[in-house]
Amino acid sequence: MASSGTTSTPQRFTGAEFIVHFLERQGIRIVTGIPGGSILPVYDALSQSTQIRHILARHEQGAGFIAQGMARTEGKPAVCMACSGPGATNLVTAIADARLDSIPLICITGQVPASMIGTDAFQEVDTYGISIPITKHNYLVRKINELPQVMSDAFRLAQSGRPGPVWIDVPKDVQTATIELDALPSPAEKSPPPEFSAESIREAAAMINAAKRPVLYLGGGVINAPTRVRELAEKAQLPTTMTLMALGMLPKAHPLSLGMLGMHGARSTNFILQEADLLIVLGARFDDRAIGKTEQFCPNAKIIHVDIDRAELGKIKQPHVAIQADVDDVLAQLIPHIEAQPREAWHQLVADLQQEFPCSIPQENNPLSHYGLINAVAACVDDNAIITTDVGQHQMWTAQAYPLNRPRQWLTSGGLGTMGFGLPAAIGAALANPGNKVLCFSGDGSLMMNIQEMATASENQLDVKIILMNNDALGLVHQQQSLFYKQGVFAATYPGSINFMQIAAGFGLDTCDLNNEADPQAALQAIIRRPGPALIHVRIDAEEKVYPMVPPGAANTEMVGE
């Protein structure tokens, strides 16, 4: 733990005061959470801070996703807090989600006094044990003198290498105990990234230069390398595909962009990948939703795999060249060795496959249809807008259709696929980016998972617009049951219809039901232009499907639908 030098006189802090002091020195300006008995000492100290604003969520899961929205847009750790017991367990889903999507979070929870741990005390659960499999690292701070090192290590770990959540569980007596410090800890910084060999760079460059049909495959791990990713793609004329987490790394309309691959990617993209003789995989983990049946994915392609996480190299597909390193550092060394090539024959084959398997966007100009609504919303904002989604059909329709053109524009739950992510993540994005419009695409099933956070958006007058596609159903469940289960649809449609307009109005949101508007596009433009939170409601037919689709367990070439 680095220190900022010896103070003129030792300073005395309670554990709670030190936590807040460290957060201030770390540059944290917003914390979100819900207080409870076991963390009240921290909240008492937080109330005295003139630097940190506290956002009171309506549910701890909401607090976790609010923190995610901040971390995803800013690229640095964000902080959420809760009490022990139910407060901590309510955070679990948001923290697990952050782990799978590599989002840097610091989760601080209160715990019963250290002497009472293991006695089934009031609101005691084994937070440390619960959080082991869903965090990058976790701590149970049993003594006050451990706290400075733990806080420093937690922030360093959360943002170093492959980012992820770190959980700090602090017993109440540690929060109230005192510590005297001669030196104050400096803000924690990232650890240096792994070094890599010049030989691996030369080998990768030789493979790229020799390839006839190379494809650049981007995952979420390229988030900090947009300039060099584009430089590599354009210099080597590499058709480029992106996972759900990487959308926006190349603008949607870029001539080299193939868009998203996998389960709901373009049919042409999945067939183009099968023709590749080389995959240059940057910051991606060969997720099953992206590659389908593993043994049938790009069977004739050699693989260059660059990832900061050694565990991902060779886990699913065996690479011919594996480089554990920061993607941007690798590209800085690799690009000078790359030959500029037109690759005209390869681009002609790509164009032929795109013509043979054109993207079908039905009713793309009708704002009362799913794709048309997405296009209409996009026409109301510029590229500064931040897009969040919940999880379901609306998520995939938005991924397919929205013109995502920059990194950190697109926030969605990829690995865990968490319904209820969208609204609180949008709140976090709006808090961290007060000058940006934030658009949250949601479905009726997902919105109900964290609908209480409408209150948080309203109380803070955040410029969050919820675009609700309401089909009175769990759309993706309905779709899979309709297509793949002999007994048809069961427990996927709701027997009643909720009046979301009244609910939103009750929370203080502006509202607009496009189905009742004479000019839906004009109404959409007007409500998005107005500042403050709003709900935009549109009815969607429950029989609508997300096409094309790779059936579960199938190869990417076995897509069904339009």
Task: Mark where each language-model region is.
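Active-site diphosphate/adenylate-binding microenvironment
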Residues: A16-I19, I34-G37, V42-L46, A351-A430, ...
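Phosphate/pyrophosphate-binding active-site segments
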Residues: A2-P10, N145, L181-A183, A206, ...
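Structural signature of the thiamine diphosphate
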Residues: R29-I30, R72-A82, A88-T109, I132-L184, ...
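Glycine-rich, anion-gripping cofactor-binding loops and their flanking helix/strand elements
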Residues: R72, G220-I304, N405-N436, M449-I451, ...
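Glycine-rich, acidic loop regions that bind phosphate or pyrophosphate groups
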Residues: S4-G5, T109-V150, A246-L349
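Aromatic-enriched
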Residues: A2, K172-E199, E203, W346, ...
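Thiamine diphosphate
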Residues: L40-A114, M116-Q123, L216, M263, S268-L278, G283-D287, L313-I316, ...
